[in-house]
From Swiss-Prot:
Sn-glycerol 1-phosphate binds at K12, Y159, L160, E161, Y162, S163, G164, G189, G209, N210. Its cofactor is Mg(2+). This is Heptaprenylglyceryl phosphate synthase. InterPro entries: GGGP/HepGP_synthase_I, GGGP/HepGP_synthase_sf, GGGP_HepGP_synthase. Mg(2+) binds at D14, S40. It comes from Bacillus cereus (strain B4264). The lineage of its organism: Bacteria, Bacillati, Bacillota, Bacilli, Bacillales. Keywords: Lipid biosynthesis, Lipid metabolism, Magnesium, Metal-binding, Phospholipid biosynthesis, Phospholipid metabolism, Transferase.
Amino acid sequence: MYDISGWKHVFKLDPNKELSDEHLEMICESGTDAVIVGGSDGVTIDNVLHMLVSIRRYAVPCVLEVSDVEAITPGFDFYYIPSVLNSRKVEWVTGVHHEALKEFGDIMDWDEIFMEGYCVLNPEAKVAQLTEAKCDVTEDDVIAYARLADKLLRLPIFYLEYSGTYGDVELVKNVKAELKQAKLYYGGGISNAEQAKEMAQYADTVVVGNIIYDDIKSALKTVKAVKGE
């Protein structure tokens, strides 16, 4: 079994986006610590299975970030369950999770399942619009969400999600200083090695996503930048 607490760099692949076999091989053999499969829309059991089978040709750990209960399938090493703490809709905080537990609770392997406390900070992002996230928040608000995830809910992961735009480094630094047991994931807008390295100073795990589809060479350079190898 893999230890997620040591992961510094992960790639996130959207099953609803096209990725060539050649580029997938580059991603999986890049030295990244893991590949997360997940997206905000168009996620189906068919494209999740296609992605799973493709990634399983390689030795890299593989995680399904669950956004749709209908697209859950066995075969992943781990399952990340996001709870959008700054959502205005209870279904994205605990509602969908309750339905999933009602349907699948008896057969879940709890050693494979990790809950993520999300704080979505880009109002233009699909995930913000889907979950009706309250993005017009102060730093004090974000710190409070971090404390909620870390100290009150005791979640293993607190995820700062800027999704498509590069975030506030000082905020990431201050959030990290608040966390005692939760690991800090940062995702959003990383388009080059320098940005990845900058966020890696404070985030425990840097998530690289969209740049994979725009500039594969720049995406691959983020691995070494984060891991310092």
